[in-house]
């Protein structure tokens, strides 16, 4: 495998010294880029884009051609695992992902197959291999999965939800069924992420988009314990290097200590917590990723630079910070504003890495 020309992102996640703070953006390959829209039109639809290794590679690399990013992230979707389990994933215009065969009973859960990453999900591994080859060692490649709880919300609700009544009904009326589903999903995520690592992913991330809708005790019970199981089951070294793992739960500022205690290397932060507060609480255990409000990218360039400086100052000196947005970049953000953001991180962070 190629040696890395820029390993800042991996070093920061392992809390090792870097020259400047590394930066990437969640959803950095996406609809805010005109070249992405053109490639997606060529593919026909979103899942066809995900399933074509050459096109998935192309959209993964597009933001790296525009911006001085310190990592690439696999272009895929968090719902690949439930799709491979046969739930009939489809996308409705303006409504997001839906499943034609949602989970409604214990029998549905017992009958779920365990997808083989090199069979039903081989298209993802082919994309990882293609991207890794085409990156030519410029920056590391991040692989990812949804968390068991977040995957289960889509599988039981049948798509996106605001109230999560169906999954919470199962959680509180038939917890045994939900725990069986979450356990099966954790096993599948472990297989899936380890296959991505084998295929060339140099770091992995678990996105727990909907963990924040749970009470503190239910978060531990239905979300965090399964992410802990995943962390324990991951390949943590490959090709002579450590493979860092980052956990990201949206709206989880109150649970940082518990997340850090899983043994992960990095914790993703959304914008609802101050990074200095997060560092004071868990900075001696994990790296922190984040955490500018993605909507700040609508602001004037000077305002974006001010916000970057504020977050850098909040984290302060020393390693262990990967700069990112607090969630995915919005689809109508001007690409030039994203460039202001990325360049500002490198420009203003060097002063914090002189030691």
From Swiss-Prot:
Complex formation: Homodimer.
Chain sites annotated for binding substrate: 27-31, 77, 154, 209, 327
Location of the protein in the cell: Cytoplasm
Described purpose of this protein according to its UniProt entry: Catalyzes the decarboxylation of four acetate groups of uroporphyrinogen-III to yield coproporphyrinogen-III.
Site feature location: Transition state stabilizer: 77
Pathway(s) it belongs to: Porphyrin-containing compound metabolism; protoporphyrin-IX biosynthesis; coproporphyrinogen-III from 5-aminolevulinate: step 4/4
Major location category of this protein: cytoplasm
GO biological process: protoporphyrinogen IX biosynthetic process from glutamate
EC number: 4.1.1.37
Protein name: Uroporphyrinogen decarboxylase
Pfam short name (any one): URO-D
Family per similarity comment: Belongs to the uroporphyrinogen decarboxylase family.
Name of encoding gene: hemE
Coiled coil residues, start to end: none
Molecular functions (GO terms): uroporphyrinogen decarboxylase activity
Catalytic activities: uroporphyrinogen III + 4 H(+) = coproporphyrinogen III + 4 CO2
SUPFAM superfamilies: UROD/MetE-like
HAMAP family in alphabetical order: URO_D (MF_00218)
Keyword vocabulary terms for this entry: Cytoplasm, Decarboxylase, Lyase, Porphyrin biosynthesis
Gene Ontology, cellular component aspect: cytosol
PROSITE patterns given in the database record: UROD_1 (PS00906), UROD_2 (PS00907)
